[in-house]
Structure formats: structure tokens, C-alpha cells
Amino acid sequence: MTMPVNGAHKDADLWSSHDKMLAQPLKDSDVEVYNIIKKESNRQRVGLELIASENFASRAVLEALGSCLNNKYSEGYPGQRYYGGTEFIDELETLCQKRALQAYKLDPQCWGVNVQPYSGSPANFAVYTALVEPHGRIMGLDLPDGGHLTHGFMTDKKKISATSIFFESMPYKVNPDTGYINYDQLEENARLFHPKLIIAGTSCYSRNLEYARLRKIADENGAYLMADMAHISGLVAAGVVPSPFEHCHVVTTTTHKTLRGCRAGMIFYRKGVKSVDPKTGKEILYNLESLINSAVFPGLQGGPHNHAIAGVAVALKQAMTLEFKVYQHQVVANCRALSEALTELGYKIVTGGSDNHLILVDLRSKGTDGGRAEKVLEACSIACNKNTCPGDRSALRPSGLRLGTPALTSRGLLEKDFQKVAHFIHRGIELTLQIQSDTGVRATLKEFKERLAGDKYQAAVQALREEVESFASLFPLPGLPDF
């Protein structure tokens, strides 16, 4: 491109074309990307979304996410930026912090919040960086038992998560017979391991956590207690499940699951008086704020994603409405309806049910596994994910399916609708068993998928898919009207 000279451009047509490019809508500017988005939008519209960590953000959240706030750099914190022109960014971040505390009914004298983490994993790692020295000890629920990768997962042969690479982690487990967390074993192991931090958080656990018990164990070992409420943050805001804030020192969360915002993260931390020195009577204050803020920036991140902070602020405002509370109660009611319907159809639900938004279906009694069932259901426009069950010997062939109700509840499905969803799932698993019988139990997943894609089963797959898509299309999809 020829550079402008004395305020005029030598190639006015080219410069005009440049201006036009900046003003073009996506469908004209990039047809390939636009078509991919349209295809994904249609997949979401005609499919049944049962992945427990997914939801449908509101139009308002998506509009904030696609705003001019994407353009602004703002390293630092409100009132302490490394760039000029941040007065409105400061206003936005302060508003988001205020709403975050209000949404969880927290006293700003006792709690603070950092809303800059890019997502949940960076938020968790920032807390570890702030509170646990390198190679310090942490304890989290084991991934195969329902924990999260960032809680320190490793195998016998390899440290998988960065958490397990830079810190020493010891997992706690569930009772393989009941599926419930074994708090007695956790207490015993904590006495031997002496962790600096205990994580109260899950990614596939259908029961409420015993925060008081976990805090007692943490106190006995001089450890911090951190809750990772990423999956249940919307339920907590609505008062549908117990709040971790009463017992925890730090609480992290994502904002796009049950909270139904955009993809981002938050870290809540205690502040104010921690204790009183019994000898001097002097108040001892928490120092978590400076440690955590420094770990987020400049420790691990650069400039915050201001468009995402705006989306979070919008979601938090929505989370304080009566409509949101009604929605969260329906999420739990729908999950119980799904669990009961599948139980009646002969399926085993780990822990026997659910207190929250998800269930884990154990397919071992059916003679199949989650990987095969997931592929068949996906071919029938039902999205869910394979997951390990308590007692599984290999994560490469997990026995379970994780099913969640937040996304479909956002579309307006009620208990009776989830009973129908359960029957769709059942028919998909019955088809899985037919294909598995045809291929043999020793067949690899690749061989199973090849048989699934063959002509023999396409009529059955298509018939179920058409029923699913016809049913799903009855319910509106939240979001932007153009997609």
C-alpha cells in the first residue's frame, strides 16, 4: 500500500477499499469463517446440548463481548494503569467487582475480588502462585474421581497438569462403592502430607461439598482452603446449593457455566481481620489481596480482556434477578428428572442421584463405555462427554457419561422434556450396544466408529437424529439474532 503524502493518498481507491474492509460485516468480509459460525449455530439450535460445563449466553452478554472494549489495552488495576485513556475501563472493572460481591452477598470489608483472570485455569494457577511456594504441597480431588485437571492431576508415569509440575500434589478420592468423597481418608492423608492448600472443587461430582469439614481439615494442617466453584457458581448465586464463602479463604470460578456469562474467571479472597494475637490483642490482617493481585498481574497475565469483563458484569447483573433464581431452581429440578428417568430405564447413576446440575451415568452394567456411547449420541445430535467413573482402571476407556442440564434449561426445557431426552439417550445407548455386539467387545474405538459410519446403521442413526432435531428445534436458542 502506498503511504499518504501531505495528507493525501496516492492511491485513493486502495485507501477507500481499506476503509470499506473495516466497515464490512462478517458475512461479506470472511465468508469461510461466517459459514463455520453459521454451521455451529445450527448445530446448537437443532441439537441437545448436555455437556455440563456449557451454557447459552444471553444476547446482552454477547453484545458486550463483541463491543469496542476489545480495542483497549489496560495493564494494571483501576487507578493504577500503565496506559492512558482508561477512565471508562476503570469504571467498568470497578462496576464488575461491585456486582461480583453483590451477587454472592459478600461484605466488601471482608471480601475482595479480582475479575481479570482470562478463565478458570489461569485463575486457579494464580492462586497457587500467590499462596504456595514452588514445589509446595496442595491437595485436590483426583481427576478420575471427579476433580479437575488444574487441581494437580498426574499419573503414575507423568505429571499432566502444570499444577503437578510446579507444585507437589496429592489427590484425595471418592469411595468407589458409593461415589461420595472419602473425607476420613482425606483427613488422614492431610495429616501425613501437610498441604499448604486444599482445593474444594469438582468437575464431575453430583453432590454438595462439605465445606465445614474441609475447613476443619485445612485448619488442622495450617492450610488455606480454596473453593473452585466453576461448575456451580450460578447455583451458589441463586442460593440453590451451599455457598463456599462461609468457610473458604479463597474462591475461584469461571463465568460461562451455570453463571451463564462469557468465558472468563474470577478470584474472591478474604480481607480485613484474620485473627487477634492472644498475647498482644493486636489484630492480624489478611494479606491475600496483594498476593493474588500481583500473581494475576504482572505475575501471569498482561492486559485484561476488557470486553470479557464487560460480559461478566452483564451476567452478574442478570444473576441477581428473580428470573435467574427461578432458572437455577429449574436446572436442579431438571437434573433430578433426568436422573430419575434414566434410573427407571435401568441405568446406574453414580451416588444415586444429584444435588446440582449434573449426573454421571455408569455404563459398566450395560456392558459398554462412555467413549462409544458419546460417539453414537453425537451422531444423533446429542452432545455429552465420556467421563471416568469411580473404580475405573483406565482413563483411556472411561465407563461413564457426564450429563448436565444448564444449557437446555436456558432454552426452556422442563422436567417432562428431560424425560423425553432420557429416552433419546436410552435409544442411542441401545444402538451403541448393537454396534458393539457387531464389532465385538475387543474392537478398538476406531473400529467401532468405522462400523458406526457404515451403511448398516445409518438408517437407525438418521431416524433418531431426525427425531432429536425436530424436538430440539421447538425450543428457542438464546444469543445474537444474526446467528
Curated annotation (Swiss-Prot):
UniProt keywords, alphabetically: Acetylation, Cytoplasm, One-carbon metabolism, Pyridoxal phosphate, Transferase
Residues found modified as N6-(pyridoxal phosphate)lysine: K257
Gene Ontology annotations of biological process type: carnitine biosynthetic process; cellular response to leukemia inhibitory factor; cellular response to tetrahydrofolate; dTMP biosynthetic process; folic acid metabolic process; glycine biosynthetic process from serine; glycine metabolic process; L-serine catabolic process
Cofactors: pyridoxal 5'-phosphate
MF GO annotations: aldehyde-lyase activity; glycine hydroxymethyltransferase activity; identical protein binding; mRNA 5'-UTR binding; mRNA regulatory element binding translation repressor activity; protein homodimerization activity; pyridoxal phosphate binding; serine binding
Activity regulation details: Inhibited by tetrahydrofolate concentrations above 40 uM.
Pfam families, alphabetized: SHMT
PROSITE patterns documented for this protein: SHMT
Subcellular location: Cytoplasm
Main location: cytoplasm
Pathway entry: One-carbon metabolism; tetrahydrofolate interconversion
Top-level division of the source organism's lineage: Eukaryota
Catalytic activity: (6R)-5,10-methylene-5,6,7,8-tetrahydrofolate + glycine + H2O = (6S)-5,6,7,8-tetrahydrofolate + L-serine
EC identifiers of the protein: 2.1.2.1
A GO cellular component annotation in the UniProt record: nucleus
Keyword Transferase: yes
Family named by the database record: Belongs to the SHMT family.
Miscellaneous section: In eukaryotes there are two forms of the enzymes: a cytosolic one and a mitochondrial one.
Function according to Swiss-Prot or TrEMBL: Interconversion of serine and glycine.
Subunit structure: Homotetramer. Identified in complex with ABRAXAS2 and the other subunits of the BRISC complex, at least composed of ABRAXAS2, BRCC3/BRCC36, BABAM2 and BABAM1/NBA1.
Official protein name in the record: Serine hydroxymethyltransferase, cytosolic
Organism of derivation: Homo sapiens
Lineage: Eukaryota, Metazoa, Chordata, Craniata, Vertebrata
